Amino acid sequence: MMAKSISNHIDFAVGFQRQDITFVYVKDVVQAIFLTLDHGMNGRKYFLSDGNVYRSSDFSNLIRKALGNPWWIRITAPVWVLRIVTSIGELVARSTGRISALNHDKFNILRQRNWRCDIEPTMDELGYHPHYDLARGVAETIDWYKNEGWL
């Protein structure tokens, strides 16, 4: 959704306070699953990320770069605007019977200012070491989207 928006020259962000977030690429998730099957403790939960903390703008900047740096307008709206948009999304979804990407669950995720994951226990217990940082994961994802005709 964000890549499509940026390819259409709009980067939409929510909230005026800094947002720190972590990311994990799907291939690193698969690695962690296999490591958990081999070395994980029953009932134990493991956090995953690429080991770095990013600002939300880092993500959109990397998407823009992978798309060839199209011109864009960055719009930052207050959190209450997101609440209205997700409420409308929920109403439309209920009335049409379709799932909305902009719903109350998404609101609760996007309004948070800190999504930092400590992967040290995962690294120590499982031997997990991420192979993809955000830049590499975004570049590979955008290439895949283009090849599949999604962008």
Feature locations, PLM:
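NAD(P)-dependent short-chain dehydrogenase/reductase
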Residues: 1-31, 35, 63-64
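A conserved catalytic-core signature of glycosyltransferases
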Residues: 18-19, 49, 105, 112
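Residue-level signal for the nucleotide or nucleotide-sugar donor/cofactor binding architecture
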Residues: 21-27, 54, 117, 132
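Residues that recognize and position ribonucleotide moieties
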Residues: 22, 52, 75, 108, ...
